[in-house]
Amino acid sequence: MTLPSGKVMPRTEFEAMVGKEIGVSSWFDITQDRIDTFAGCTKDWQFIHVDPEKAKQSPFGTTIAHGFLTLSMLSAMIYEMPSIEGVKMGVNYGFNKVRFVSPVRVGSKIRARFVLASIEEIRPGEVQTLMNVTIEIEGETKPALVAEWLGRRYF
């Protein structure tokens, strides 16, 4: 499988984007099948995620995506963002903050907006990025989540 990739740019050009939005991902569908598959992986079978009939009685009125499902979608969304020329691999280094602001109802579309907050050299051949990320829900004013995401890139 070939993963989609965003623009590749020289490191100096990427570093010049600190404090700026580097991109917005495409929309991703949140289907009941996606939610059920995630529930199977995590063993989180709470009815608000997997039981459409019972979820109608919840404050959400329907099933909702797991917060961690929404967060995990960042792995797909980041592939659409610009990358640094010469990077051989990148790894998720964790999060400083994550807030689940709004529920993501089944049938919604979500996308991520990425702002490069910082980039620093850890050692020769390794940099750390900090992205301020907002996952938006199509048609909603409040985001699904906001996070400070750390990544390591290796040259």
Predicted regions located by residue number:
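A generic structural signal for short beta-strands and their flanking turns/coil linkers
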Residues: 24-26, 34, 87-96, 110, ...
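A solvent-exposed, acidic/Ser-Thr-rich amphipathic alpha-helical stretch
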Residues: 66-70
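Predominant activation on well-ordered alpha-helical scaffold segments within soluble catalytic domains
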Residues: 36-39, 71-75
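Hydrophobic beta-strand-centered segment that forms part of the acyl-chain substrate-binding groove
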Residues: 58-62, 72-113
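Generic structural detector for well-ordered beta-strands
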Residues: 23, 27-29, 99, 150-152
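Catalytic strand-loop segment that frames the active site of acyl-thioester-processing enzymes
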Residues: 2-65
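HotDog/MaoC-like acyl-thioester-processing domains
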Residues: 1-16, 103-155
